[in-house]
A protein has these predicted regions:
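A mobile, often basic/glycine-rich helix-loop segment
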Residues: 1-12
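Adenosyl-5′-phosphate
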Residues: 21-236
Length: 236
């Protein structure tokens, strides 16, 4: 896709900036032609690149089989929606994956933990069907990633709210993992797990923790390994 000289320059730039960005790690992975998935969406929504999984799995054959099954599943999904535009394909994948397995699950878990009933009116099937019928070029506008939603609220909310930049919401996991929780997480991650020894490489886990401490990867990667090991110790 890219001329070799341009590819090298982009890779070098990404490498120089990569120390604290998983997104750039994935970009580097993509540019080097190491991603063979059904759609680039799955690369940027995944926690680990295939190369990283190779260092975490203790059984290369098992990893190969799992990657193959996942590729078949995702390719069938992409093929079933081949009539969609690029924008609508991303919307569909977000709705059927990240929103479904992460956002809605987290919303339900956290709201129920505090006795709250949460509703999601923007997921009404009639509204979703309407949105998929609208041409893609109307859904993206320079300087306004969600122009239809923004315009629909122009006369209902103060201007400073409608025009303000997107505000993310991220819990301070990194701060916790480098502070009060470090001892607990380090104990779990650096202790071999008999229940996972046939699947997970302890050396790979330790390297991932070291990368986090050196700010070469985000908190979400070692955190996911910590949760996996805690779950295995409790349930297997």
């Amino acid at each position: 896709i890219f001329p070799i000289d341009l590819r090298k320059k982009i890779i070098q730039l990404a490498t120089n900036l990569m120390s604290s960005s998983d997104k750039l790690t994935k970009l580097n992975h993509l540019i080097q032609g190491q991603y063979n998935g059904a759609h680039v969406y799955f690369l940027f929504r995944s926690l680990f690149c295939e190369q990283e999984l190779g260092s975490l799995f203790s059984d290369p054959l098992l990893l190969k089989n799992e990657i193959s099954k996942n590729l078949q599943r995702t390719q069938e999904l992409i093929d079933s929606q081949s009539q969609l535009s690029t924008v609508d394909t991303i919307s569909y994948l977000e709705m059927s994956h990240y929103m479904n397995t992460t956002l809605l699950r987290d919303t339900d878990t956290m709201s129920m933990a505090h006795g709250l009933e949460v509703r999601v009116p923007l997921l009404d099937h009639k509204l979703i069907e309407l949105m998929f019928s609208i041409p893609s070029n109307m859904k993206i506008k320079k300087g306004s990633p969600k122009p239809l939603l923004t315009n629909s609220l122009t006369n209902k909310l103060p201007k400073f709210i409608v025009q303000r930049k997107k505000m993310g919401f991220t819990l301070p996991f990194e701060h916790w993992m480098r502070g009060k929780m470090r001892s607990e997480i380090e104990t779990v991650l650096l202790s071999p797990s008999d229940k996972l020894s046939n699947f997970i490489s302890q050396d790979g886990v330790q390297k991932m923790w070291s990368n986090f401490l050196d700010k070469r990867c985000s908190w979400s990667r070692p955190w996911s390994l910590y949760v996996l090991k805690k779950w295995a110790d409790k349930n297997l």
